[in-house]
């Protein structure tokens, strides 16, 4: 994993070093008609600037200067002739009416761009109205992800602040060699389905040095995700870092080679979680490493849930997802529930190869009840000091 992490960092670093080595041609969105007054629709200006830059034979830079720019759905298509840079010094805001982007699935989407750097600035999707619609049980649009990378390769996303997404803040799908660095993601703890970063069907993904405070998973890792390195994340509020949910279909792709390290979880619903539906599936989750983690009053610091069902109409079968080779090392802190370690695995496909090493999790309880471990259909071993006492 160390070699993969180094290669990813080196590749994406080359993208922003190029502009230091050769002149970059700037495409200022204001020159294409954008106005940073917060209420003039600048969507067409942004699209024209992107289109011109994408056709450029010089090293292009789409530039958003200081100001507040109202934009509707932005579909930024490749492939482009050169590596692209998209630099935001201002703030992008969505229309106040959530329907303006709510039916588009994505607010800002980069599609089939190979060699892309997105820097800085703030995007604010103004999701409050959409969340109210969802909570009120009304007929609502599907909701939009704030920024999505689809079929993109060699991508750097750095320094972005994402506020109040209708749904997922940052999405990565069918992409490779993507580095997300020093982003800040914020939405209220009660905002529904506002995952911070969601990765699916992608490989070679690094997420580093970021603060994620939201209403759902800080980071969610979906089927088909391979070779991920997640480090120095401040997570909370939210639902923790989750692999899954998995097992929604029989022919689902697996998840493998994931590392989560040197991160802090504060008052989250879960810490590190693997979740799968209780139904047949050919999926798997294997070669997973969770190390050097601090839990601060976290609901379930260590959790495998193979009977995942957050709502009604649960399948109530046996999960076909095979969970194996999972290591938890140097995980310390406090749990807000008594079950600090919970492995609720499949009867037909027990979890195997679980390793607990140097764990110290105490129950944050005014009655001083000790933390406990719960295991069902889980097989593994322990090393060093493990608190609470391991099932293995």
Task: Label every PLM stretch briefly.
Residues 2-392:
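Extracellular/periplasmic carbohydrate-active domains that bind, remodel
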